[in-house]
Amino acid sequence: MERDNRDEDIMMRGTKQEMPGFRFRLLRPEKKRELWNPDFELLFLLRGRGRVSYEDGEVHNLPMGSIFAINRFQICDLDLDEDGLALSLCVSAETIASFHIKLLKCEVKCQSFFYMEDQQEKFDLIRRDMARIFLEMYKNNEEQPIYMKSRVTALLEDLLSYLSLIHI
């Protein structure tokens, strides 16, 4: 377990971890995430298994590789198994509004755990988008904020294009 934590620290070292309007964070079992926040959040279960519980009482088991969205102000509890590790990307309402105002008026239904392995294509695209944003953080050049914003824009466009949205 100690070795795994060192690997995670190495993974996050060298990144700026926060850019204006969006940020990454690693979630571990011992550190609980807040039940709600004003940001849109996309979570990717990197290791282990977990459970997600929603305010309406729904509880879902999460296999490794699950990706799912937590909409703004949505109450949601995440429990990770002892060896669980999740990557969270939070995008502020202001950032979303500057890219896609339509997304602020919708609830994104991104829950890969509802689909079989042969139905993961659209979620693989979202996983790839998220990985590209994360990798962009490692680049150390003056255009980094521009590239990061373009990657976040691509992710938001893919969410709008490929996943069901409920207008609120």
Residue spans of the language-model regions?
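Hydrophobic recognition helices of helix-based DNA-binding modules
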Residues: V52, M137, L156-L163
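Conserved small/polar residues in nucleotide/adenosyl-binding loops
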Residues: I166-I168
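All-alpha amphipathic helical-bundle segments outside canonical DNA-binding/catalytic cores
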Residues: Y138-E157
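Conserved metal-binding segment of the jelly-roll/cupin
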Residues: L62-I75
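Amphipathic, well-ordered alpha-helical segments in soluble domains
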Residues: E41-F44, L125-R132, R151, L155-D158
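A hydrophobic/aromatic-rich effector-binding and dimerization subdomain
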Residues: E2-G21, I75-Y138, S161
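Generic protein-terminus/edge-of-domain signal
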Residues: M1-P63
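Hydrophobic, helix-rich cores of sensory/ligand-binding and other regulatory modules
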Residues: A69, K105-E107, L125, Y147-R151
